[in-house]
Amino acid sequence: MKLSEIHMRDPFILPYEGVYYLYGTRSFHDTGFDVYTSTDLVTWSEPHSVFEKSPDFWGTIDFWAPEVHVYKGKFYMFATFINDHTNRGTAILVADSPMGPFRPHSDGAVTPKEWMCLDGTFHLDEDGQPWMVFCHEWVQIQDGTVCAIKLSDDLHHASSEPIELWKASDAPCVRHLGWNDEAFVTDGPFIFRHDGKLMSLWASFDETGYIEVMACSDNGRIDGNWSVDYPALLTGCDSGHGMLFTTFDGKRKFTCHHPNCDPDERPVLYSVDGLTFTKD
């Protein structure tokens, strides 16, 4: 398969032992996750199921944005879920292989239970402290925020109160949603380092549609002061919710979904030079 044949939102690529593993949201209404594999980023396998909803699993809809991170010899999936009786939130699943099967690890969502949250991602700081960085959703607070919370060493639960890193309207390139002039969106944070600086990708909207945006911590730490005073990295192409990874020959790549409309979303790849993205 080619990437253009894969219907997916929120793509995430894990390079591991010579194989690239591609995870993402199947659709808004599906209740499971797949992985696609490749050795060259061009030809991909057929989908292989890594997680399917069981009768006793707490999430019932909105199976969104799976990310898989290697930590202490295990593979941890951060993914978003909701049901009729709880708020949307990011939970953590675990597996012994990037091919799954993944099983529930956290006791429900790790994000605050009283908040509507999504798109949790993993960060391990220089002190070895694990964090989840996530979005407090605009549907609850209008001006969406990106927040962070410390995790227990075993990634089973949160071990601190959340801290707010920035809000969507702080970014000069972000515009409110067209049908709601008080709604500003934060989606898909992804933490990375560039030239020694701790930075984050995230997604929102401007007058052209979905965009990819950037933030930077002033002290190289999650709990620093974050600036979002940057132009959009991607605008005018209705693309976003991206992440960075390094190929096996040492090149940095970016992937996101394009366009941002169902059912046309496909994962796309960009080559990265500094903070300049060029579509492959």
Predicted feature residues:
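Carbohydrate-active catalytic/glycan-binding domains of CAZyme proteins
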Residues: 1-280
